[in-house]
Amino acid sequence: MYVVILAGGGGTRLWPVSRPDCPKPFLPLLGDETLLQRTVKRVAPLVAEGDLFCVTDRRYGQLVRDQAPDVRLIVEPSARNTAAAIALAAAVIERPEDEVMVVLPADHWIADEDTFRSVLSVAANRMAWGAFDIETPLVTLGIRPTTPSTDYGYLRPDTMRGSRLDGVPAYPLLGFEEKPTDARAKELINMPGVAWNAGMFAWQRGAIQAALEKYTPLPMLIGQATGSELALAGAYDRIQPISIDKAVMESAADDRRVVMGSLDVGWSDLGSWTALLAGLGGGEAGGASGRVVQRGETIEVGPDDLVVRPVDGRLVVESGSAVAAGTGGTIAADGVWAHLAGARSLAAEVHAMLDRVARQENRP
């Protein structure tokens, strides 16, 4: 078994903290370690030395080297979403066809790391070797939903055929659903076994290579170019950005080639200010919510709100009362802000997070 961590992305829903030059995986949002460092530490006990890899594009190669020097780095010429990143890893990491590749995002938060490792081990050592009459399936790990969220895609399992595999609930997967409407999310969360799609996978190297060859041109484009940086850059110029879900997993589920393992580990992708506030609050946002405000946008700011904005080249957090003083509560943003509604009780936590980020960015 070897683990491939995918690190990149603009993290635009967390601006102005997460920016293209230093996106979410490389920030210490919920402690002194960055999300990438926490991910590496979380999975390191499962693999031998030399079996932990990170795929990122050339903008972030040095950040990975600095933050995770023991991880073996695979650098993409440019960002082309997860399908290309996984295809590149499958091509360049030379392992036996039946060795299991685990794929994880670099920027997720997991509270119960022991249970996470246990489930991941079952996915790699049991599920990926065959289940529900599927030989060498593609395994995806689904998160037990806690709210009818419209921020995530959903996984629909065949609960009639599900069972526990080494203690982990597992099912053949019927299909994927894109981020739903409010009404559809409320329907989905009441369906047995339905899970959030978290982008975590386990599969034999040969299984994902065969699936990529069946559903995409990526192995042909990338496989012929891995020996030269120039050739690989040219191949990437011809690749359209597409997720592994769209490129492979949805079709594989239609062909009944996917198994879902169920995770209940206190998970968050920290993909929005609302999710980050919940993380800063120890798992509860206390009714607070947040969103990115664009330059020139007019917003209503209340006394229980916070605003994160750049002032004199640094990010500061200010109370709604201070920001909107003398305006009657209505103000136009003079840059990219974060408006954190009802977050006054989390002011100290937001201050501390901004201080950690500033120290990280100022390191030599």
List PLM regions with ranges.
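Conserved N-terminal catalytic core of the sugar/cofactor nucleotidyltransferase
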Residues: 1-5, 13-16, 20-121, 127-130, ...
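Residue-level signal for inorganic ion chemistry
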Residues: 36, 89, 107, 155, ...
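A short acidic, often aromatic-flanked loop/helix-cap motif at beta-alpha or helix-coil junctions
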Residues: 79-84, 147-149, 182-184, 267-268
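Left-handed beta-helix
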Residues: 203-364
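Alpha-helical scaffold segments in soluble metabolic enzymes
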Residues: 25, 38, 42, 63, ...
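Conserved core of the sugar-phosphate nucleotidyltransferase
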Residues: 112-224, 229-234, 256-257, 325, ...
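Generic preference for hydrophobic
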Residues: 26, 73, 176, 259-260, ...
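Solvent-exposed alpha-helices and their adjacent loops that cap or buttress functional pockets
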Residues: 6, 45-47, 93-96, 102-103, ...
